[in-house]
Design a protein with these regions (language model features):
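Surface-exposed, secretory/extracytoplasmic low-complexity segments enriched in Ser/Thr/Asn/Gly/Pro
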Residues: 1-240, 244, 293-295, 300-310
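Active-site scaffold segments
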Residues: 244-301
């Protein structure tokens, strides 16, 4: 049962054996060892084992591109017991594991690779589109599933989702803008169905078009675009009516017609004719794109000059 000697008992037994001229002392039989508080047969130990085994019955499989399984191997790392055989399930460790799970599978703002219709392959970072695990909600759900000993397959709870779990998680239907070449494409099921030269934001900190992976947030007809307030005048720096508005960011970037532009493409955007961040399009192309887009359609904005975050 134990290897710790009870010196008080041992001394008494040695004296007793010496007095009685006994030459061999069996320390175990004579109770010279300190008995453990619990043995494998103790009810408290059995109860603790039963409790832990209930947790270890659970197996939660997250259906990702490659399944992620939370089973007894991992759950056992979250279980412990104290000197009184009270079992503890460390929920904080579950939450920490879920945070790491989110870091692994979240794609919002991450660096992804895209090959343009012209064959150019570039990295694109930033933006608002992609997978984002609801770590708090999913950690709570995982804890409950483990406590119940559930054996289930499931998708994690997401704050937002994307088209696919592939590396290019925007799928095969999306709008793409190349700031460097001042050109955009609308691609449906992998095929270009619309393309045109554009004028993007003037490359200054306050007007540059942000690069990254976004999505269409809003579609509106006959909208007046309003700039920031000029402190000197107390009025917006611009108020511009457009026929077709396709919002990409809540900070005011989007696709729209720009009938005031006499030309598109080239280096126009580098002059004062560059936009305030929006993607200016010919009227007929803006109308066609508007008719084909839907809210949620991914938008990839790239630039060979480097990544520029949304303002």
């Amino acid at each position: 049962y134990g290897t710790q000697v009870d010196t008080e008992v041992l001394e008494k037994k040695v004296e007793e054996y010496r007095t009685e001229f006994k030459d061999e002392l069996n320390m175990l039989d004579e109770g010279c060892y300190t008995l453990p508080k619990y043995t494998s047969d103790s009810p408290e130990v059995q109860a603790a084992c039963d409790t832990m085994n209930e947790y270890l019955k659970a197996s939660i499989t997250y259906k990702m591109k490659e399944n992620v399984v939370v089973d007894k191997t991992l759950i056992s790392e979250w279980l412990s017991y104290d000197e009184n055989m009270n079992v503890t399930f460390d929920e904080d460790k579950v939450k920490e594991w879920m945070r790491e799970f989110g870091k692994t599978y979240d794609t919002v703002g991450s660096t992804r690779t895209i090959t343009t219709p012209t064959g150019k392959t570039v990295n694109v970072s930033g933006g608002t589109y992609g997978w984002s695990v609801d770590e708090a909600t999913e950690a709570t759900a995982l804890i409950e599933s483990i406590k119940k000993g559930e054996v289930i397959e499931k998708e994690p709870t997401y704050v937002q989702t994307a088209a696919t779990h592939d590396a290019q998680d925007w799928g095969s239907t999306y709008a793409e803008v190349d700031v460097t070449t001042q050109h955009m494409w609308y691609i449906v099921n992998g095929a270009v169905v619309l393309e045109t030269d554009v004028v993007t934001g003037k490359p200054t900190p306050d007007r540059v078009t942000p690069t990254g992976v976004y999505s269409i947030l809003e579609l509106k007809r006959n909208k007046t675009l309003t700039g920031t307030i000029n402190p000197a005048t107390g009025k917006p720096i611009y108020q511009t009516p457009v026929d077709y508005w396709m919002r990409v960011t809540w900070t005011g970037v989007g696709f729209h017609d720009a009938t005031w532009q006499s030309a598109f493409g080239g280096t126009i955007y580098q002059t004062n004719k560059g936009s305030h961040g929006c993607i200016n399009m010919p009227l007929n192309m803006a109308a066609s794109l508007y008719d084909q887009l839907s809210v949620g359609t991914p938008v990839i904005i790239i630039s060979a000059m480097g990544q520029v975050k949304d303002r």
